[in-house]
């Protein structure tokens, strides 16, 4: 694991920073993500120089900042969310009229405040999870009802659906001034710490009853965890790694590639695929900034978002198996295999049991207040019912990589 963290495409962090000192971090990161296979430092420098020269060959009409929370060229090769691909494609598509400075590693904003920094105009684009963004922009909670999405394919199907425009995107823009562009899709489970290293592999929700688990900022995720007797406790990120290592908490709710990219794998012993609500690392932008662009540039933003959505769909599905190791059996040399993280895939019967414990479909009362609140904010849409229906329009056995891409901003 150490080698994977300290090098990207075979180049050390120190050498990457040296190259970035000459050509800028954005050009260097774009060169890294655009490369195939391993690079020498000299090859990276040449690629970064070529990228820099291309990006600055003409004066940009608009220069925008993307606040990418903790993301960088290294971890975006683990969780394939498409943020750098979007920035590079938008620059190329507009022939340099739009230039994006990618600012990651929490240098300008973090998971909890990137959306606010976008609303305030500190950054123009941002990348963060919808769940962490919900604290500032609560309409994001529309995605977080328990078992609303049965699988990853259903998530992609919804985000490609033109109906996502009226249910998610338009109300978010109207209420919070954020234009939702594209997202990666996984489902959240429980990531058990080292306390569970020598215990039997989890096969039932009953084995998790009474455990204490770190919860993110999601308010709806907390409801689901309480109903499943998973005792959600808010723990600062800094304390989560130590809590999982020392056994102060049993686990943490998040998705598999987050464990891998955020360096949680050394302190996680079992990744329990509970699939109890959505996990989305997404890219959004200020709606004011979007509206300030002329028509062709607006079209370019949407087409680049579409390309990034398609790219993330294919690349993250491959990375879950080939990079993360979220499979059974696991491939060797994956992050989970290297760190002895066992994957606990529950049976359909066990997932149904968990769903019946906490889903609004079977246990509506704890969710009624949020459903009414979101209905009011959306202008009268029962968002849970609508998304639940759309998520089941495709066959249950559809593979995520086989979901048909659609340009969601156009009418069906």
Language-model features and meaning:
Residues 2-155, 180-412:
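N-terminal secretory/targeting leader peptides
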């Amino acid at each position: 694991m150490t080698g994977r963290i300290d090098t990207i495409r075979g180049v050390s962090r120190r050498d990457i920073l040296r190259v970035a000192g000459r050509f800028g971090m954005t050009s260097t990161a774009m060169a890294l993500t655009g490369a195939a296979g391993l690079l020498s430092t000299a090859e990276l420098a040449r690629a970064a120089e070529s990228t820099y020269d291309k990006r600055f060959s003409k004066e940009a009409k608009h220069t925008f900042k993307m606040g990418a929370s903790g993301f960088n060229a290294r971890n975006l090769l683990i969780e394939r969310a498409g943020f750098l691909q979007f920035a590079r494609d938008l620059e190329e598509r507009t022939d340099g009229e739009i230039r994006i400075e990618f600012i990651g590693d929490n240098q300008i904003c973090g998971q909890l405040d990137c959306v606010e920094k976008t609303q305030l105009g500190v950054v123009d684009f941002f990348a963060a999870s919808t769940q962490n963004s919900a604290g500032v922009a609560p309409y994001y909670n529309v995605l977080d009802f328990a078992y609303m999405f049965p699988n990853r394919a259903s998530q992609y199907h919804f985000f490609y659906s033109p109906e996502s425009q009226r249910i998610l995107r338009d109300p978010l823009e109207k209420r919070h001034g954020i234009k939702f562009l594209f997202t990666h899709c996984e489902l959240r489970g429980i990531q058990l710490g080292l306390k569970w290293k020598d215990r039997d592999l989890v096969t039932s929700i009953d084995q998790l009853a009474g455990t204490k688990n770190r919860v993110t900022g999601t308010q709806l995720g907390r409801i689901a965890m309480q109903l499943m007797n998973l005792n959600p406790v808010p723990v600062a990120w800094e304390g989560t790694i130590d809590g999982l290592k020392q056994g102060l908490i049993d686990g943490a709710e998040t998705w598999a590639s987050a464990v891998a990219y955020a360096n949680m794998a050394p302190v996680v012993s079992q990744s329990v695929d509970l699939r109890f609500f959505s996990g989305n690392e997404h890219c959004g932008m200020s709606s004011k900034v979007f509206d300030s662009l002329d028509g062709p540039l607006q079209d370019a933003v949407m087409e680049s978002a579409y390309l990034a959505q398609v790219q993330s769909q294919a690349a993250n599905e491959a990375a879950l198996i080939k990079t993360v190791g979220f499979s059974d059996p696991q491939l060797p040399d994956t992050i989970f295999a290297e760190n002895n993280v066992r994957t606990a895939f529950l049976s359909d019967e066990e997932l149904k049991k968990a769903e019946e414990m906490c889903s609004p479909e079977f246990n509506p009362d704890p969710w009624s207040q949020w459903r009414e609140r979101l209905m009011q904010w959306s202008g009268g849409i029962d968002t849970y019912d609508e998304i639940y229906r759309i998520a089941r329009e495709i066959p249950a056995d559809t593979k995520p990589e086989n979901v048909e891409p659609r340009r969601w901003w156009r009418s069906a």
